[in-house]
Amino acid sequence: MTRKQAIDYAIKQVPQILPLEESDVKALCEQVLSTSSDDPEQIASKFLEFLGHEDLSFEFVMKFNELLNQNDKKEEKKTKNVHLEHTAPTSWKNESKQPTNNYINKKGDEKPKKLKDEKKSSTTRPTVQPSNQSTQSNPIKEKKEHRSKGKLQSLQEIDEAIKMLELRDSGSSKNCNCQGTRHPVFDIAPNCLHCGKVVCVIEGLNKGKCGHCHEQLISDNERTQMVEILNQEKNELNGSSSSLSNASNGANVPKKKTKTYKITSGMGKNLFAEQDKLFDFIERKRERERKRNEVLKLQEEKEESEAKERQASEHDHKAEENPELLAAQERLDRLLYFQDTSAERTKIIDNASDFDMNQEVGLWGSARERALALKKQQRNLRKWEKVEKERNGRREKYVVSMNIGSNGKVTMTEVPKDTENVIAGSDDDISDISDEEDISDLKHIHALKSEINTTKSLENLHLQSKAWDYERDKKQFDRPTYVKKNSDTAQQNRKTEEKAHDMQAYDLKSRVQVDQNADASVEQNILAVL
């Protein structure tokens, strides 16, 4: 790749970061390359000043510098190969015809014999190196380029992260006190855990330590864990890419074997009877498989129940040991569950509240008021269903006018309905409505409202007419009259009551009757009592 191809890469990538035209991008690249003297750090800083400190801009700068470095190396190789072709003497040509083993075993410090002739013939040309170095380096570079092209982009990112997290001291340590204002914050360790300093990307990547207290931002254990995770992801991606390549190359994938049944018919055999036997056999086999699956399912359920019981017992044991830890774990699980299901848990769909008219009625509303609220709710629900049908494309067309032209052409005009206001008003004009059901409901609503208003007005008049009248209230009650009793009559009544009481006592017989005859025995009297 040449410098022009690097600029072409910039022309493709820069418009994704900033809305610039092709000419502006070319001018920007030429200006940066001319003022930076091919220094990668200066090129990166100037591009970042223009493009901003974002992920896309960092990726673009790294790729651009890589392309420029590859260009320089390739140009040097090409110049060396050209000089070798033009300046190689005859003695070197003869040596190149020797076997490859001798050619490879030659030392790089050997000098050609005819150096004087070379100096005379190539005064304006640079010094020539042995050809074995160039021939050996070319296949290595080609292999590396071939390997890098075959990898995925995500694998390259993982390799870069692994290299960054390797446990080795980097010589180029930089301190940056921007506190994340100029450069983006280091996501892995945004601030130091010892002094609290905010760490930017430059300080985190290049140094790995805090510039204030000189403590490590990431511990050794965390680094090793991150490297293991990245290696695991890399292996997974390599496996997926290899499987995709095998599938694209048409690798043999094992197919599932299909069961086939054959029916042989011979002389004197009924084919339909053989088919019936085969179908019965297949049904019995399926029934056995179904029963087997049921048994396996029951076993799995038993195992799951046993595992749950074991977990519950362990849970209770832990609760007995440390109840505070158990309560904290349950709270954490509940909060994580709420976090996962927050979108569904906070979504409230309450269509009935939009059409609820019970605020006017209350708990002690009359029968007419409740009927009026029900009619309003039914009308609103019907209107809402029509609006939903219109949203789904099953709307009714309302023709306003129909005109017949001179050529016999009929034109019909249609008015779009207002779907924003879903709640139907109870005081709508009947002349503006074309639906017969809606008109009948509205008439009924108006009649109920008029009846309710008349009853309320009559009740108000009745309450207003009620005033306390002393004379009218006095006529409702009669004056009490007191009767005086004579003392003689009271004494006579008392005597008659005493005589009646004595007569009742004389007439009563005792429950236990004992024979008065002396001849009767005591045993008979006891038995009579019992």
Swiss-Prot record:
Main localization category: cytoplasm
UniProt-annotated location(s): Cytoplasm, Cytosol
Domain of life according to the entry: Eukaryota
UniProt-annotated stretches for the region Disordered: 75-153, 290-323, 479-502
GO MF annotation, one: K63-linked polyubiquitin modification-dependent protein binding
Compositional bias annotation for Basic and acidic residues: 75-86, 106-121, 290-321
Disruption phenotype: Defective activation of the ribosome quality control (RQC) pathway. Mildly defective ribosome stalling induced by RNA arrest sequences. Sensitive to anisomycin (stalls ribosomes in the rotated state).
Record keywords: Cytoplasm, Isopeptide bond, Phosphoprotein, Ubl conjugation
InterPro entries in alphabetical order: TRIP4-like, TRIP4/RQT4_C2HC5_Znf
GO biological process: positive regulation of DNA-templated transcription; rescue of stalled ribosome; ribosome disassembly; ribosome-associated ubiquitin-dependent protein catabolic process
Cystine connections: none
Biased composition (Polar residues): 88-104, 123-139
A GO CC annotation given for this chain: mitochondrion
Pfam family, one: zf-C2HC5
Cross-link (Glycyl lysine isopeptide (Lys-Gly) (interchain with G-Cter in ubiquitin)): 509
Phosphoprotein is among the record's keywords: yes
Cleaved signal peptide residues: none
Residue numbers bearing the Phosphoserine modification: 426, 431, 434, 457
Other facts noted in the record for this chain: Present with 1710 molecules/cell in log phase SD medium.
Function field: Component of the RQC trigger (RQT) complex, a multiprotein complex involved in the ribosome quality control (RQC), a pathway that takes place when a ribosome has stalled during translation. Specifically recognizes and binds RPS20/uS10 ubiquitinated by HEL2, promoting recruitment of the RQT (ribosome quality control trigger) complex on stalled ribosomes, followed by disassembly of stalled ribosomes.
Record's protein name: RQC trigger complex subunit RQT4
Record gene name: RQT4
